[in-house]
């Protein structure tokens, strides 16, 4: 979470590219994924986002990164409802959101940081933040997988560098 997995994915991609590899996917547990190039028979890599029923269950990913953030609950005792692992810095308390945010952008580090940031912010404020990242797209999903909001089309298969 945060930016750690995104940074690790980005570094792995840099190492692969430095070794001359032009086509690859690095997947760090479904929530942080980056791709370069494409498989021989497609324009991009098919990536399952694990959000069935939204039309976003599987997208084509090429030369970009994707990150998903949602509030998990960590129980502290048997029968406890649990506490969230993402903290709202303005309140100093766990985020109460049941939303999942998925961000797509070239940099895996930025994707990871943005998806967590957008989970904390109100949607309209999050969209304003995204305006500072011209290549970024995002989707906010409800706990039942319904699309609440979208900023640009996250399904676009390729992103310009």
Residue ranges with predicted function:
Residues 1-161:
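Mature catalytic core of soluble alpha/beta enzymes
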